[in-house]
Amino acid sequence: MNAFTSFTKIAAGSLLVAAAAFAGPFYPAGATTLHFAFEGSPNGDRPIVRPPAIYHADDGFGFVDSPGLIGTALGVTAPKYFRFDVNLPAGTYEVTVTLGGTREESVTSIKAENHQPMVSDVHVARGEKAVKTFTVTVKHGAKGDTSLESDGRLTLEFEGTNPSLMKLDIKPGAKPGG
């Protein structure tokens, strides 16, 4: 077992404990909110996710197609683009992101599920942060359907100039448009 496998198993285990109303293959029933941190040190219900935490279905979360992704004590960033996926049961979710925190100014736009714009051009000064919340619906398609819209995962695409992410919270049962 290499360090990455060890880390993802520990992070996934921490996430499972944190995910005590999600139902599905990855989350036990009763979870209220999933918490991910991309900065700082482990904090109870918020596992730290650092590159190269590549998405694997068994782990249930990770980065996908994210060239140039850099992890620091202040969060993750890339020159222009990165993507983070999370296995989720079909449903509507309230997603809260904390952007910024990196050593450079960042401009971040977020797309979710089949490239739907959720957040546009959030400018964050060096060392500062911004919190944004949006609602997204995760769908499950027919077996073998691998489109970003119906693959059983929440797909979040971060793009812009030095797009950055410090924290991610996912809460089930949000009302569409809310």
Regions found by a protein language model. Name each.
Residues 22-178:
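Compositionally biased, intrinsically disordered or flexible polar/acidic segments
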